[in-house]
Curated annotation (Swiss-Prot):
Pathway: Steroid metabolism; ergosterol biosynthesis. The keyword Nuclease does not apply. It is a peripheral membrane protein. Keywords: Endoplasmic reticulum, Lipid biosynthesis, Lipid metabolism, Membrane, NAD, NADP, Oxidoreductase, Steroid biosynthesis. It comes from Aspergillus fumigatus (strain ATCC MYA-4609 / CBS 101355 / FGSC A1100 / Af293). It comes from the Eukaryota. The lineage of its organism: Eukaryota, Fungi, Dikarya, Ascomycota, Pezizomycotina. One of its GO terms (biological process) is ergosterol biosynthetic process. The gene is erg26. This is Sterol-4-alpha-carboxylate 3-dehydrogenase erg26, decarboxylating. Heterotetramer of erg25, erg26, erg27 and erg28. Erg28 acts as a scaffold to tether erg27 and other 4,4-demethylation-related enzymes, forming a demethylation enzyme complex, in the endoplasmic reticulum. Pfam families: 3Beta_HSD.
Amino acid sequence: MPQKRPTLELGSVLVVGGCGFLGWHIVDQLLNFPSETDASVALPKPEGDSRFDNPRLADRYPRCVAKVSVLDLRTANNRLPGAQYYDGDITSEESLLAIFRKVKPDVVIHTATANVLEGNKELLRKVNVDGTKTLLEVAGGDRGDWGGKCKAFVYTSSASVLHDTQSDLKNVNEDWPLIRGKLQLEYYSDTKAEAEEIVLKYNRASPSSMVTCALRPAGIYGEKDTTFTFKVLEHAAKASPTVLRMQLGDNNNLFDFTYVGNVAYSHLLAAYRLLATQTRYESGQSGPLDHEKVDGEAFNITNDSPVYFWDITRAAWALAGKVVEPNQVWQLSEDLLGPVGAVLETVFGLIGKTPRLTRRIVRYSCMTRYYSCEKAKYRLGYSPIVSVPEGLSRAVGYVLARERLESEKKGL
């Protein structure tokens, strides 16, 4: 007999950034996967290829009972039936209060972030730090009366807050310190770490005693992914067979790649646990024991199955029809390509462009970077539902199907 799915009752949930990559998947799960039942919002996949046939997600993730609202800067795209959508600016108190008065959320899930690849420091700080603080204080009742009380606030941080972008990380847990200031070479990660500190410090400190937590996903990929999956397949499409045989480093470096649906699931579990904690506090009971505590805590979120970096890259290429056999691989030294990347960055920088090979790409292709998610498994009840290979099948299938649809529209 099929296993009975648990039910998560979450009340009124406001997903901030709900039209983005992760946010869309959170909304889809909250609404019990209209993407699998409504043809108008179905995720495309290649037809007639069993490699892209996967079990239904709705049969495996919990059923949710929630009133779902979405706040994003622009909500014209990536909509799902069953949710209410609001255009808003998290850096504007006035904009947020107007939306909160309509939604009256019990839970805020904050996924909105400035794009890490833009490199605009002013924008990164304005959105990731100042915007998070404004949203947090509006939700907690410190910035005006919106006629309700938000009970729980879940913040999407990043596993990169524990990483200096250079060192190898092996099974790192939440005891590892945040990498801040001069030690942090990536400004995006510094802003995410600062925002995380603000969110966790705000736990039970607001007029409404709202409880908070932060989740740190590592290497998110999946349908609608515009970073890892898209760029790996873009490279496969443009590169010659000779270039595809080139491997940066020795491929002994394990790396975390986490399916976006599992990350979305962790957010719903966190919201559910926070609501349970808030109920305890409101009823006068003592809070959870330290080793069970969710509020005021940060959690690493992974697929609990690190993979060799080039194995998953070549697996993605193979799904797209670009197969590179192990005996065809040419191993190139990181010590050689790092300086080459630096030279290319300098040359391309003179004409205002970014080369395809940079020092960052070389380092990330060669480093070991994986985390422990034991804390999330124990305290949130988290366990990845979709495996890394299935997630890759879903992610690659989506990109290939979208490309086919776009070609058909153009009449090519």
